[in-house]
From Swiss-Prot:
Keywords: Methylation, Ribonucleoprotein, Ribosomal protein, RNA-binding, rRNA-binding, tRNA-binding. Residues 125-140 have a biased composition (Basic residues). This is Small ribosomal subunit protein uS12. Gene3D superfamilies: Nucleic acid-binding proteins. GO terms for molecular function: rRNA binding; structural constituent of ribosome; tRNA binding. Belongs to the universal ribosomal protein uS12 family. With S4 and S5 plays an important role in translational accuracy. It comes from Desulfitobacterium hafniense (strain Y51). CDD domains: Ribosomal_S12. Part of the 30S ribosomal subunit. Contacts proteins S8 and S17. May interact with IF1 in the 30S initiation complex. It comes from the Bacteria.
Length: 140
């Protein structure tokens, strides 16, 4: 426990908050071939380099759909493909947002459904905006 004199002399140091989506903090200058701190983006565009399934951590069991994506700032990240079924393959252009998947180690990003080459989830009636699904026709 510090004395009051020690606190007056040095004070308390602030703990810097680490970003949960560090790849979103960088931009890329293609002319100089350099990365630079851009202050962060809400989403970034990228190209799928590999689309695969992986298994979650211990208590859970499933085949989670994941894509390895090279972003426009040249950083390569693993991102989760939400929803049932997808049309992604290698060289698909996708939009990536932050947001980790708790039971998949190393997956800190989500692919945005219904943007660029990614189709929305078919026959999705609830929480449609999260899965890029269009509003169903009135008659059906």
């Amino acid at each position: 426990m510090p004395t009051i004199n020690q606190l007056i002399r040095n004070g308390r140091s602030k703990i810097a908050k680490k970003s949960t989506a560090p790849a979103m903090q960088w931009g890329y200058n293609s002319l100089q071939r350099k990365q630079f701190a851009s202050g962060g983006s809400p989403q970034k565009r990228g190209v799928c380099t590999r689309v695969y399934t992986t298994t979650p951590k211990k208590p859970n069991s499933a085949l989670r759909k994941v894509a390895r994506v090279r972003l426009t700032n040249t950083i390569e990240v693993s991102s989760y493909i939400p929803g049932i079924g997808h049309n992604l393959q290698e060289h698909s252009v996708v939009l990536v947002r932050g947001g980790r998947v708790k039971d998949l180690p190393g997956v800190r990003y989500h692919i945005v459904r219904g943007a660029l080459d990614t189709q929305g989830v078919q026959k999705r009636m609830q929480a449609r905006s999260k899965y890029g699904a269009k509003r169903p026709k009135k008659g059906k």
